[in-house]
Amino acid sequence: MNIYDILDKVFTMMYDGQDLTDYFLVQEVRGRSVYSIEMGKRTIAGVDGGVITTESLPARELEVDAIVFGDGTETDLRRRIEYLNFLLHRDTDVPITFSDEPSRTYYGRYEFATEGDEKGGFHKVTLNFYCQDPLKYGPEVTTDVTTASTPVKNTGLAVTNPTIRCVFSTSATEYEMQLLDGSTVVKFLKVKYGFNTGDTLVIDCHERSVTLNGQDIMPALLIQSDWIQLKPQVNTYLKATQPSTIVFTEKFL
């Protein structure tokens, strides 16, 4: 009999596309609660209170209490732990998801384990995962932007950096995406280049790259340009010189 045959509902964890509940039962996950802020502070002699000098979000650390299981024999348990080591060790951040947050993805990698008791083919362990990026990611959103002021709403709960994509319907000598406050241009991205009909321009505000038909044309981006960000839960008004598409990923803390 498989251990899952006696359980009504199983909490699942996916790591780099692999369902780890094939190897262990999750008891508890820590590191997903109200998030802390790291503050740099200083005081001035003779002055009441203090001064906050810096603020930042620390890396996220996920702790997973688990019970590794086999078929009831110590030999099978050892083999499963060997294979679990193979699955966990990664040299890049990978997607991590939990069944109680089906539309959220963390990105991190396994760091270390704290061993617990082992008895009767079961092994208790706490697995620690280090997420350089403290944010978790939701679905990807695609919105069209026209040559008139267009509202784009970031429905996430954190600032996100969009990717702009334009397939040129006519030839042009420049492309511009503007961020507006009423009729005022707050910031813009402008690319001066000889664009032909059918060319595909991609401006990635996260990677800070500009490509045309897959080729780098970063030098064509005007130095006065400023990368566009979408603030959470509000409309950002954008306007383009050619019909374009904005793609962004919702982010959460």
Curated annotation (Swiss-Prot):
It is found in: Virion. One of its GO terms (biological process) is symbiont genome ejection through host cell envelope, long flexible tail mechanism. Pfam families: Sipho_tail, SPP1_Dit. It comes from the Viruses. GO terms for cellular component: virus tail. The keyword NAD does not apply. Keywords: Viral genome ejection through host cell envelope, Viral long flexible tail ejection system, Viral penetration into host cytoplasm, Viral tail protein, Virion, Virus entry into host cell. Gene3D superfamilies: 2.40.30.200, 2.60.120.860. NCBIfam families: phi3626_gp14_N (TIGR01633). Forms a 40 Angstroms wide channel at the distal tip of the tail. Remains associated to the tail after DNA ejection. Homohexamer. This is Distal tail protein.
